[in-house]
């Protein structure tokens, strides 16, 4: 891979750099399927053993799985960092710690997504189907399967791409690599946090409705 320079002498994004971070986002999003299956299986195990989980114990179980997902995400980030720097010779630059923090926060969202889908679905097939569908949509809009330039040329996708957290992650990282001074990094950090909060709020509403029905 060759590092190119634009007319202003600022560094542009190479294909190796672009797909390093785009595919890392895809890898971390895959953590949602792992967490979703774990949450579903634990829920089913409690059902088989006729153990009715209290609201507190269910929340504790969800948080423990989310913590596991974050740990898995951190390990994935470390592995990708080692591989891309040593093998692909990708230079993460002076913003390495910011990039790592960004992907850890995205790991929080991915884990929360998997946990909420896992606790909400009644079959493991539904868990896998819903998460795979969400993953595909987020990734295709975010530029994991093609460059963002190609997405902007598709009439419908160039409107929907703003809904993908991966789009904001890729855009923020690319601007930082190019040395541009924007607030996109803050935006890309806040979006996964806000989405995680919304998912948690949704799960609380569902549980309260379930408790009112049981009563």
Residue spans for each PLM region:
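Transmembrane helix-boundary elements of multi-pass transport/secretion proteins
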Residues: 1-53, 58-75, 94-95, 178-186, ...
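Interfacial helix-capping/hinge residues at the ends of transmembrane alpha-helices
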Residues: 45-49, 80, 114
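Short polybasic/polar patches that bind polyanions
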Residues: 52, 84-86
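Hydrophobic alpha-helical transmembrane segments in multi-pass membrane proteins
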Residues: 26, 30-34, 68-84, 106-111, ...
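Conserved short-loop catalytic and cofactor-binding motifs
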Residues: 35, 88, 157
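Membrane-spanning alpha-helical segments of multipass transporters and channels
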Residues: 81, 91-215
